[in-house]
Regions:
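Short hydrophobic beta-strand element within catalytic cores of glycosyltransferases
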Residues: 362-365
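Short alpha-helical donor nucleotide-sugar binding micro-motif in glycosyltransferases
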Residues: 324, 332-337
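Conserved acidic donor-binding segment of nucleotide-sugar-dependent glycosyltransferases
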Residues: 377-378, 382-390, 399-404
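Nucleotide-activated donor-binding/catalytic signature segment of Leloir-type glycosyltransferases, i.e.
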Residues: 306-328
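Conserved donor-binding/catalytic core segment of Leloir-type glycosyltransferases
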Residues: 255-283, 295
C-alpha cells in the first residue's frame, strides 16, 4: 500500500496551518484512491451526518476516487457513483418500535448479543457495535482489495483501533463532540432523569479515547475544532478543518411568493440543544400583534419540554412539525418561509443554516458554537441573537417580517455566501487533499 503512495509518485500536498487546522491552497495530489467511508447510521432524515455521507461520497466519486460507503441502519440514500455495503444490526431504535425486544432468531453473532445487552443497561451501543462489525468486514477481505484509507464519520468505536492495528489507515470526521449535547441535556433534566442520560452517553468515554489515538481528525468549523481539542483532548496538530457544503443547484431561491408570517426551523432531535423552547416562547410573543405560523422540520417528543411548552403557550394551532420530508419538499418549505431561524444552544456547523441561505431565505441565528463562523457577521447574511433569549429572537424575527428590504438583503447575501464558501465539490476536493496529506505523512497506521 505504501508503495502505491510513495512520495516520488505524488505532486505537492497542501500545507496545513497548525494554529487553525485549515488546509492551504496549492497543487494537490489527484491520484485515484480507494476510500471506505464509514457511518454507523446514515439515512438523510437521521440528521446532518446522513447528508454529509450522501454528498461527500458522490463528489469524491465524481473526482475519480473509488468510494465505498459502509453503513449500519438506517441506510443512506446514495447518488450514482459510490457503492453501498450494508452492515445489518439488530436496529434496536427503529421506528415505530424503538427499544424493541428482538426474536432470538435475530441474534447472529456475539456482537448482536453485546448490542442487546448494552441497550438493556440503558447504554447506546451503536458506535461500538458498528465499529466492530466494520472491522470484521474490512480485515476479512483479501489484503489486495483493502481500501487505501478508511474514513470514519464520528463512530469513534474501539473497532476503529482494531482496524488500524490490522494495518489499515484510519482517519475520522468529528462534527462536534457529543459531550456538548450531554451537558445541555443534563442541565435541563431532573435529578432522577440524569441517571439514564449519563448511561446513554457512556459511549463518550470510548469516543474520546479513540479520537486521541487516531493520527488525523477532520472537523467542520474552527469552533468545533476548539471544542474537540478541549473535550476529547485531541492534539491540535492532528486537527484539520473542512467546512460542510450544500447542494446549491437544488437549494435555490423560490420562483413563487413566500408565505406571509411563516417561520421555519429545523431540529434533527427534540433535545434542549436545539433551542426549540425559546423559539416557541418567541413565537408566542410575536403572535400577540401579528399572524405567524411556525413550521419545524423534525418530530416532537411526547411528554417532553417542547410538547409542554406548546400546550402552555397556547400554540397548538400555530405550530406544525413535519418529518421525513423528501429533498424536494424540504427545499419547497425553505423557499416558502418569510424567515428561517436556527435557535440552537450549540452547533458544530449547522447544515440547515446554509441550506436556507442557499434558498435566499432571510435567516435569524443564535451566536452559539460555530453559527457566527458559518453565517457571517451580524447583519450581513443573517441577524444574530444570543442563545436561549426568547425576547431577542422575537425582536429579530419581527424585524425581518416587518422590513422587506432587510429580508431581501439578508437573503441575497446568504445565497452569495453559500456560492462562495459552501459547495460539496470544494468539500470533496479538500477532503481528498487531506487523505493524500495524511498518507504522505506516514502516520496513519502507527
Amino acid at each position: 500500500m505504501r508503495d502505491r503512495l510513495a512520495m516520488s509518485d505524488r505532486e505537492q500536498v497542501p500545507d496545513r496551518d497548525s494554529s487553525t487546522g485549515a488546509v492551504a491552497s496549492g497543487s494537490v495530489d489527484t491520484r485515484r484512491l480507494r476510500v471506505a467511508l464509514l457511518s454507523y447510521r446514515s439515512k438523510v432524515h437521521s440528521g446532518g451526518q446522513g447528508v454529509y455521507i450522501r454528498h461527500l461520497s458522490r463528489e469524491l466519486a465524481a473526482l475519480g476516487h473509488d468510494v465505498e460507503v459502509i453503513s449500519g441502519p438506517p441506510y443512506p440514500e446514495l447518488d450514482p457513483g459510490p457503492r453501498l455495503t450494508r452492515l445489518p444490526s439488530l436496529d434496536l431504535y427503529r421506528e415505530p418500535d424503538p427499544f424493541r425486544i428482538p426474536h432470538w432468531r435475530e441474534f447472529r453473532s456475539a456482537i448482536d448479543i453485546l448490542e442487546f445487552a448494552m441497550m438493556c443497561t440503558a447504554s447506546f451501543p451503536e458506535p461500538l457495535t458498528f465499529s466492530l462489525r466494520s472491522w470484521r468486514v474490512l480485515v476479512n477481505r483479501p489484503r489486495e482489495s483493502w481500501p487505501d484509507i478508511v474514513h470514519d464519520n464520528q463512530t469513534l468505536g474501539y473497532g476503529m483501533l482494531l482496524t488500524r492495528k490490522a494495518g489499515l489507515p484510519v482517519v475520522a470526521t468529528v462534527h462536534h463532540p457529543i459531550a456538548v449535547d450531554r451537558r445541555l441535556e443534563l442541565a435541563a433534566a431532573t435529578l432522577r432523569k440524569q441517571i439514564p442520560i449519563r448511561r446513554w452517553y457512556s459511549f463518550l468515554r470510548m469516543q474520546g479515547r479513540v479520537a486521541r489515538r487516531l493520527p488525523a481528525v477532520l472537523t467542520v468549523s474552527q469552533s468545533s475544532r476548539a471544542d474537540i481539542i478541549t473535550s476529547f483532548e485531541v492534539q491540535a496538530d492532528r486537527m484539520t478543518v473542512v467546512p460542510l457544503g450544500v447542494a446549491h443547484d437544488v437549494f435555490v431561491p423560490p420562483s413563487q411568493p413566500r408565505v406571509p408570517g411563516r417561520i421555519v426551523a429545523t431540529a434533527s432531535a427534540d433535545v434542549p440543544l436545539k433551542g426549540l423552547v425559546p423559539l416557541l416562547e418567541a413565537t408566542a410573543s410575536l403572535r400577540a400583534d401579528r399572524p405567524v405560523e411556525l413550521v419545524v422540520v423534525g418530530t416532537v417528543r411526547e411528554g417532553g419540554a417542547t410538547a409542554a411548552a406548546i400546550e402552555r403557550l397556547g400554540l397548538t394551532a400555530s405550530v406544525r412539525f413535519v418529518a421525513d420530508l423528501s429533498e424536494a419538499d424540504l427545499v419547497a418549505l425553505f423557499q416558502s418561509a418569510q424567515v428561517a431561524v436556527v435557535p440552537s444552544l450549540y452547533e458544530g456547523f449547522s447544515l440547515p443554516a446554509v441550506e436556507v441561505m442557499a434558498c435566499a431565505t432571510p435567516l435569524v441565528a443564535t451566536t452559539a458554537g460555530a453559527l457566527p463562523e458559518v453565517v457571517g457577521p451580524d447583519g450581513e447574511a443573517a441577524l444574530h441573537v444570543p442563545p436561549g433569549d426568547p425576547a431577542a429572537l422575537a425582536a429579530a424575527i419581527g424585524r425581518v417580517l416587518d422590513d422587506d428590504g432587510l429580508a431581501g438583503r439578508l437573503g441575497a447575501a446568504g445565497r452569495a455566501r453559500v456560492l462562495q464558501r459552501y459547495t460539496w465539490r470544494v468539500v470533496a476536493e479538500r477532503t481528498a487533499a487531506w487523505y493524500h496529506a495524511c498518507l504522505a505523512e506516514g502516520g496513519v497506521t502507527c
